[in-house]
Amino acid sequence: MYRELISHKIAELKKERKAIILAHNYQLGEIQDAADFVGDSLELARKAAKVDAGVIVFCGVHFMAETAAILSPEKIVLAPEPRAGCPMADMISGAELREFKSRHPGLPVVCYVNSTAEVKAESDICCTSANAVKVVESLKSDTVLFVPDQYLGAFVKERTSKKIISWPGYCPSHARIKPEDIVNLKKHYPAARVIVHPESRPEVTALADEVLSTGQMVSYATRADVKELIVGTEIGMLYRLRKENPDKLFIPVSEQAVCANMKMTTLPKLLASLENMQTVVSVPEEIRVKAVGAVERMLRVV
């Protein structure tokens, strides 16, 4: 009853504020249910760039709300939980990227969207896990710098002819997914397909039937002619997969693959955000104008 009451208040305030609620696939189920749109980083970036609403309430982690603010400076972007950061995004700073570039002069920088606005501003083009291969292939250079995710960089390297020089960052949640977990689960579910996220270690992706972004996982789960899927990504993804495919069995590779930051946003925090119009996320204009080019170039890659 309490949850229904909060959800009703959120829906009312959303109309009053002329707001749209965007949520990442890793958010709590209650947040996904309250959202107008749920998706992966690429889908959310595209949505943020096109929405008519004057207020965007972003339920995710900080870099996602920042990306929305970069793309839509005329809109109010709210983060219900401003402390929700991204450990991988914090593994490289703008200064560190500038030093990295100085050691490899002239090479283009492909920046995973899981990064700060400052790092995006120092990059040539952004990418997400859904379009990383296409983005790298779109560049003329035979060698590219890839930041900050070394495992996504390794995934791209296997699928292109280009030389990838990666920054040694990683996602702690996906790093908890172990190959032996997949091997053990396959013994119990021999008919199951294995789908994993490209932020996983190479020895994990090597055991997968498909390596997919979270948005691609949703599409694959719906169309795949299989009743059992072993899923290697952050545990929040299982909520949407099960909700949209109640006739299928989804087994997490690891219950330890949890992003605590993604779970910080709750219904009461979402309600408070709309009530008080907080917390506004903004990017300094001198950084935004540099970062927006990298993000928009990514969005132009089909």
From Swiss-Prot:
Sites where the protein binds [4Fe-4S] cluster: 86, 171, 259
CC terms in the record's Gene Ontology section: cytoplasm
Pathway: Cofactor biosynthesis; NAD(+) biosynthesis; quinolinate from iminoaspartate: step 1/1
Keyword Repressor tagged: no
Co-factor note (free text): Binds 1 [4Fe-4S] cluster per subunit.
Function: Catalyzes the condensation of iminoaspartate with dihydroxyacetone phosphate to form quinolinate.
Family according to the record: Belongs to the quinolinate synthase family. Type 2 subfamily.
Protein name in the entry: Quinolinate synthase
Species annotation: Dehalococcoides mccartyi (strain ATCC BAA-2100 / JCM 16839 / KCTC 5957 / BAV1)
Gene label: nadA
